[in-house]
Amino acid sequence: MPKQIPVYLFVGQLESGKTKFIQETMEDPNFDSGDKTLLLVCEEGEIEYDPSKFAFGGVHVAQIEDKSELTAENLTALEKKSGCGRVIIEYNGMWLIQELYDALPDNWLVYQSLATADGTTIKTYAGDSAMRSLLLDKIARSELIVFNRAEAVNNDAARQELHKLVRQASRKCDIAYEFKDGLSLIHISEP
């Protein structure tokens, strides 16, 4: 049986801060497992990765530019080419999560799923039924959602609205708010 590969999945809409989150994670020496890492990038945002700032080597970056490339055969070939012991996926916000799960090789196991959302645009996404469905799709399987640029939602009414949105998709997903001066976990009592 092939070696099991842990997958760290980063999901969210375009411009929600996924690349920045992953870049910061890769700059943290505590994230160095000693394994080679396959970084799968499924969408191009405004920010590019800077591998020279990664805290460790052995990172192979691969682009998945079209959903048709998301197959078990292609992903297995990338695993073999990179010799990876773990995978980080920056997933396309317009693709459904189930499409990824259906494409993962049998030995790839989603170890952690993190969602990001932009506090300045989240209300717009939540108000549009098609975009809301895509957003809820990402939150449903995430352990944590980070609302960045949280100054835009830094009041009780906005946080209650976001809390309800997240709870519509998942009762288990933790909620964090990222402000310019740091990250904050704000507890809101469950109804």
Give, region by region, the residue ranges found by the protein language model.
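Short boundary motifs at domain starts and secondary-structure transition points
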Residues: 1-2, 136
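Nucleotide-state-sensitive switch-loop elements of NTP-binding domains
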Residues: 2-11, 16, 20-127
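Hydrophobic pocket-lining residues within nucleotide cofactor-binding pockets
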Residues: 14, 150, 191
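A generic structural motif
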Residues: 63-68, 175-183
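Phosphate/Mg2+-binding loops and adjacent switch elements
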Residues: 86-176
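Residue-level detector of conserved catalytic or cofactor/ligand-binding positions
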Residues: 184-191
